[in-house]
Amino acid sequence: MSITVTNLSKNYGAQKVVNNISFSINKGEIVGFLGPNGAGKSTTMKMITGYLQADGGAAQVCGITVHINNNETKSKIGYLPEANPLYVDMYVREYLAFVGSIHNIETSKQKIEEIINTVGLTLEANKKISQLSKGYKQRVGLAAA
């Protein structure tokens, strides 16, 4: 997967939060997105993943322009925000199947078990999300992403 950001900008009223940022990430690259609080990291990630409309510029994921093909972009990229929005009354397996069905992603029992194993949730998979530690809740969010 490649990501290309060109002159991406976002304003909240008169405050410029992201100002013409440009970068590209090639398939297979691992990068860190660092900066002080309020620097625009989360805002930039929300624009790249299609959860927030940019005021200027463009972001492409796998050659797909985010604001034009928002749903297709979301099917190509997972995003786990710091404040992980989970339905805590659901069981882990139930939640993963639910999220998959919302995004039209394969939710066979075999696929869900594969994801559970990959993120290290095997021993927690039969529990309600409300019973999990913060770390395991993050893993559920990662599995859902």
Where are these regions (language model features)?
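ABC transporter nucleotide-binding domains
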Residues: 3, 10-145
